[in-house]
């Protein structure tokens, strides 16, 4: 019995470990993918807190019907900075992997506060408190630090910042600087004003910022479709 237990554990360990040696062969090399900005990151945290992932997947499968409805199937590269990832196949509501830019900011605010006012058949709950609640920005740097420990390239040192400038460009690198996290969050909220309220930053603003970037980072016109099939 002991030998059987050891054999099962060994097999399970191999199943978990071996794919790690081939990870570079399964993640597509594409331009544009970056970590979340501080505002988007807080929006993602709210998305998870409110249980949005229980009804919405973020994984478009490589089937024709999914392409026609949602757009290009999801790439592994697009989720490389997600901890935890938001894949899945349960869809009480539609997949959101490419919802970014599909609707206006105002539509999202209205849909989140009163879903049936824009989609009459919707069964989604109302989330009016998101519009009334100020966004807590006090721990955004700590959240970025935690993700940095998992390998997400948020920067603390000048060397890390310079590496991000080289990889993502200065504009993105500035947003990934943990030392300026709170200031960067407030600046993006002020500049883009996702909720239409300029006097304060609300939770709904962070959530809309997150939703509006989903699926927008990769320019698929730059790649031949055959390239992506080599990673599947």
Residue ranges and their predicted role:
Residues 59, 126-128, 212:
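A mature extracytoplasmic/lumenal domain signature
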């Amino acid at each position: 019995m002991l030998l059987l237990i050891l054999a099962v554990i060994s097999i399970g360990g191999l199943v978990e470990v071996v794919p790690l040696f081939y990870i570079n062969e399964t993640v597509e090399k594409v331009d544009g993918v970056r970590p979340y900005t501080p505002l988007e990151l807080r929006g993602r945290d709210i998305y998870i807190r409110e249980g949005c992932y229980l009804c919405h997947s973020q994984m478009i499968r490589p089937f024709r019907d999914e392409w026609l409805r949602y757009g290009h199937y999801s790439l592994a590269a697009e989720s490389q900075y997600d901890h935890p990832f938001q894949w899945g196949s349960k869809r009480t509501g539609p997949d959101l992997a490419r919802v970014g830019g599909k609707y206006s900011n105002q539509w999202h605010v209205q849909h989140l506060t009163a879903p049936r006012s824009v989609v009459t058949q919707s069964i989604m709950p109302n989330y009016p408190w998101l519009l009334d609640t100020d966004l807590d920005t006090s721990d955004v740097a700590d959240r970025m630090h935690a993700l940095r420990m998992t390998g997400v390239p948020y920067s603390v040192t000048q060397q890390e910042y310079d590496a991000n400038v080289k990889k993502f460009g200065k504009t993105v690198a500035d947003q990934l600087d943990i030392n300026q996290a709170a200031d960067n969050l407030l600046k993006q909220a002020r500049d883009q004003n996702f909720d239409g309220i300029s006097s304060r930053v609300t939770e709904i603003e962070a959530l809309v910022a997150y939703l509006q970037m989903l699926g927008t980072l990769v320019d698929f016109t730059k790649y031949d479709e055959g390239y992506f099939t080599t990673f599947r």
